[in-house]
Amino acid sequence: MAEPPKLRVLMVSDFFFPNFGGVENHIYYLSQCLLKLGHKVVVMTHAYGNRSGVRYMTGGLKVYYVPWRPFVMQTTFPTVYGTLPIVRTILRREKITVVHGHQAFSTLCHEALMHARTMGYKVVFTDHSLYGFADVGSIHMNKVLQFSLADIDQAICVSHTSKENTVLRSGLSPAKVFMIPNAVDTAMFKPASVRPSTDIITIVVISRLVYRKGADLLVEVIPEVCRLYPNVRFVVGGDGPKHVRLEEMREKHSLQDRVEMLGAVPHSRVRSVLVTGHIFLNSSLTEAFCIAILEAASCGLLTVSTRVGGVPEVLPDDMVVLAEPDPDDMVRAIEKAISILPTINPEEMHNRMKKLYSWQDVAKRTEIVYDRALKCSNRSLLERLMRFLSCGAWAGKLFCMVMILDYLLWRLLQLLQPDEDIEEAPDICLCHHRGVEVSEGLRKKIK
């Protein structure tokens, strides 16, 4: 018989496979490493197209694609209480001990954390983003975050800059916030066996083509670099609203033969695109931590990036050239990168990345956060309401009303369907037997 799981963790976010991005990769790789450490991990996300219901992924990772459809930017419509029945069922079925929510943008994450705390579960939140304080959208989002984190057990941020930002936005105690960086799968992102010729210098851009990722900067930077360096070409991977602007720039400056537009690039093809280049260009206007930079560095590319958010913390100074988010400064940074390109050794850079970043290390550090969360004392409803009341003169009262109603609905659900009536799901330990994955329960029959 296999040993019972150490912890039973529910990862919750609107962002997961088959969608691709930094948050999606983080949840997937962290879950896989936690499974290898002996924990049970279940993921809850919304349905993607016809992908709905329960699915199993590599290593026995169980994913609940709940029948909620994305509303805008891959997030579900905020129902506040609509997700309570299904969250309660999953928590009981999987015998969850820790609920781990990801990303401040995720509606599903905020609602699941609220319901989990109402039911007395330990909750952890990871913030993958940076937010401002001045515009209307940021003010609204910061208030939502303050509500979600008022009753949190522990929080994780992916950089020191992100930690400071989250503490300021949410009013959370810094003692409750841990800094655990992202990582990269260095086994997947390796340099090319034969380095591309430097006769033609290829600059690679892989990013969502949106304002926040600095697509407007690319429109100004690319023509100027092409004018200064006839032997430079660009490969741009990604899609988004700003794709049209880049196409117009290419037409306007007659750069069709020097700027290749790939469109959306699946994560499985990212490495094959990266190894065709010499320099990786990141033009983000705000970034808590950029996994794309790690992937490029692991493939042996020299990075040029904007000096924003947590980006300066990601790589050593000799592996990245930083610039202000200004077209002229970025052009100067690219010129500097081209001049030091002959000194770059891709294999040496890859080996350094293997030592600097590891998902196994991220998982072990996350384990410590889970242990800290489990040691936090359970608070009564009155104590929890006092926390929400301190969130503001009007907002505090509103938050208290929301939580009281959530508590009453949970009690009503317990009357309509007692906890004992929710069937517990069996633990399935996938192991390899003659090249086939089988459940622990079938192992004896096979033998």
Swiss-Prot record:
Summarize what gene deletion causes: Defective in pollen germination and pollen tube growth.
Which Pfam families has this protein been placed in?
Glycos_transf_1, PIGA
Q: Which GO molecular function annotations are given, in alphabetical order?
A: phosphatidylinositol N-acetylglucosaminyltransferase activity
Membrane-topology descriptor: Single-pass membrane protein
Topological domains, Cytoplasmic: 1-387
State the superkingdom.
Eukaryota
Hey, which stretches end up on the Lumenal side?
409-447
Localization per record: Endoplasmic reticulum membrane
- Major place of localization? endoplasmic reticulum
PANTHER family this protein is in? N-ACETYLGLUCOSAMINYL-PHOSPHATIDYLINOSITOL BIOSYNTHETIC PROTEIN, PHOSPHATIDYLINOSITOL N-ACETYLGLUCOSAMINYLTRANSFERASE SUBUNIT A
Please state what the protein is called: Phosphatidylinositol N-acetylglucosaminyltransferase subunit A
Q: From which organism does this entry originate? A: Arabidopsis thaliana
